[in-house]
Design a protein with these regions (language model features):
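Extended beta-strand/beta-hairpin segments
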Residues: 1-52, 59-138
Length: 138
């Protein structure tokens, strides 16, 4: 395996702390959402960061697949929904829904494009077999 890029971030204080990337571009306060018993308020959380990263990566994968398949992709967007869940056994797990909007192709083509992107997206490859990921073409 050949490494093309490595991102580095450091977190302090857990869900109610701070996260900063090595280059300082990401420099964010973290807050546990009220829904999870935290203070909420100004600050992000790991689920929002994961949803943002997965959505951006997946949309890029859709563009790569569309280019290879010569699909006319006028415009596209992906919205990531990352849920923090607890199983009946008390285990904490994430689940993901990716909602894709694709201009210039039929609904069936959009679904096929999302399925193909799911096979090449690095986030999809990392999560496959580990968490539930649902694809929704809108």
């Amino acid at each position: 395996m050949k490494t093309l890029y490595t991102a580095v971030s450091t977190a302090h204080g857990g869900r109610d702390g701070h996260v900063r990337s090595s280059d300082g571009i990401v420099d964010l306060d973290l807050r546990t959402p009220k829904e999870m018993g935290g203070p909420g308020g100004a600050g992000t959380n790991p689920e929002q960061l994961f949803a943002s990263g997965y959505a951006a990566c997946f949309e890029s994968a859709m563009r790569v697949v569309a280019r290879k398949q010569k699909l006319p992709l006028a415009d596209a967007s992906v919205t990531g929904h990352v849920s923090f869940n607890v199983t009946e056994q008390g285990k904490y797990v994430l689940s993901v829904e990716l909602h894709g909007k694709v201009e210039g192709v039929s609904h069936e083509e959009a679904e096929a494009l999302m399925r193909a992107a799911h096979e090449v997206c690095p986030y999809s490859n990392a999560t496959r077999g580990n968490i539930e990921v649902k694809l929704v073409a809108e």
